[in-house]
Amino acid sequence: MQHYVTPDLCDAYPDLVQVLEPMFSNFGGRDSFGGQIVTIKCFEDNSLVKEQVELDGKGKVLVVDGGGSLRRALLGDMLAEKAAKNGWEGLVIYGCVRDVDVLIQTDVGVQALASHPMKTDKRGIGDLNVVVTFAGVTFRPGEYVYADNNGVLVSPSPLKMPE
C-alpha cells in the first residue's frame, strides 16, 4: 500500500492538482490513500455504492457525490468491509458515514463530511461514472484522487510521491 502525503504532492505538482475545500474528515483505517476515480452521484440512496464495493477496486477510489446530505449515511461497516475485501483503495463521500468505530479499524480509506446513524433508502436511484462537482473541485472518472489527514486533492494523471 502506497503512502501519500498531500502537502508533498501539492509542492511537487502545484500546477497539476486541485485541492478540495477543507470539509472532509478521515474515518477509515488508512491514514492515506489514492487511486483512479470511479464516481457515483446519488442522494440518500446508497444502492450504487453497495454495487460498486462488491466489484474489484484495486487501484481505484470510489468518489460519491451524495449532495452533501447530513441526514443519512451512505457508508457503514458492512460496505466498508466489502470495499476493503475487494481491494478498493478508499472512498471520498460528499455525505455521511456511520459505524465509525468499526470504519477506523477497516483497511480502507474513508473521507467524508460527518457521521450519522441513520441508513439510507435502497431505491436503486443514482448515476455511475458521471462527472461530479463538489467542494470546489470537479471529479472525472479515470482521473486520480489522493487523500490523507491534511486534505484531498485531484489530478488528471497519476502522481508519484517525491523522493
Swiss-Prot record:
It holds the Pfam family RraA-like. It catalyses: 4-hydroxy-4-methyl-2-oxoglutarate = 2 pyruvate; oxaloacetate + H(+) = pyruvate + CO2. SUPFAM superfamilies: RraA-like. Disulfide bonds: none annotated. InterPro entries: RraA, RraA/RraA-like, RraA/RraA-like_sf. Belongs to the class II aldolase/RraA-like family. This is Putative 4-hydroxy-4-methyl-2-oxoglutarate aldolase.
